[in-house]
């Protein structure tokens, strides 16, 4: 009797319900021309869904878009040392007393950057071309691409490698405005991908012509720029 009751209890015992949390499906539409341009490849990895959605958000925004670079773009100049000559910087490292402090691209966002190495003044390169200039926007073009920094008092005249793109703008107020956009999740995602949404491993100045930026009113751009400039001024103190 006891054994039969035990068997009955085991039989009617409810099994614990296991809930599987499903990840939301990521999707986007892809034009036929994009598919053809990508070698008629249909793998999802070829088209970064979030990157394409980011571009769609910008294109459908209330302000419309303007190109970051190009004839009608916001940028005046975008270059890195040796870009025109297509040559790499030849570095000669030395002790502190014989050279210039040399900063790594990863240090351009540091609050108190200190040179990791020293480059000899005898190196076959234009040292002035390597020095950063105040009121310039910086982008890392290789390695960890897409890092963005603003050259204020702290970085002014510091020597950085050719792995950093230097950018100036036609209108000064666009400096802080574009900085804020490229630091945002949407802006940085667009910066690190191409027009098809694929992640790129290297940024050249020409890539900036493919970057859409919200064409906000000038007064809003000026306000954003002023806030960025003030924030960096406080960091410099």
Residues covered by each model-derived region:
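Short, contiguous, well-structured surface segments enriched in hydrophobic/aromatic residues
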Residues: 97-102
């Amino acid at each position: 009797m006891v054994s039969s009751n035990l068997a009955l209890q085991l039989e009617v015992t409810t099994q614990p319900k296991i809930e599987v949390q499903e990840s939301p499906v990521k999707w986007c539409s892809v034009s036929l021309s994009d598919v053809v341009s990508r070698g008629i490849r249909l793998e999802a990895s070829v088209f970064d869904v979030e990157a394409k959605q980011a571009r769609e958000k910008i294109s459908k925004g209330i302000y419309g878009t303007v190109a970051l670079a190009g004839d009608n773009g916001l940028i005046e100049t975008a270059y890195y040392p040796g870009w025109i000559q297509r040559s790499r910087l030849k570095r000669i490292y030395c002790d502190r007393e014989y050279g210039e402090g040399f900063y790594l691209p990863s240090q351009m966002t540091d609050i108190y950057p200190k040179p990791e190495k020293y480059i000899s003044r005898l190196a076959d390169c234009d040292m002035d071309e390597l020095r950063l200039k105040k009121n310039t926007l910086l982008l890392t073009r290789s390695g960890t691409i897409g890092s963005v920094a603003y050259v204020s008092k702290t970085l002014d005249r510091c020597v950085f490698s050719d792995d950093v793109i230097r950018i100036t703008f036609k209108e000064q107020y666009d400096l802080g405005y574009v900085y804020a956009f490229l630091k945002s999740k949407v802006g940085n995602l667009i910066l690190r991908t191409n027009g098809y949404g694929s992640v790129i491993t290297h940024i050249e100045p020409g890539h900036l012509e493919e970057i859409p930026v919200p064409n906000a009113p000038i007064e809003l751009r000026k306000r954003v720029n002023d806030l960025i400039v003030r924030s960096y001024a406080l960091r410099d103190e």
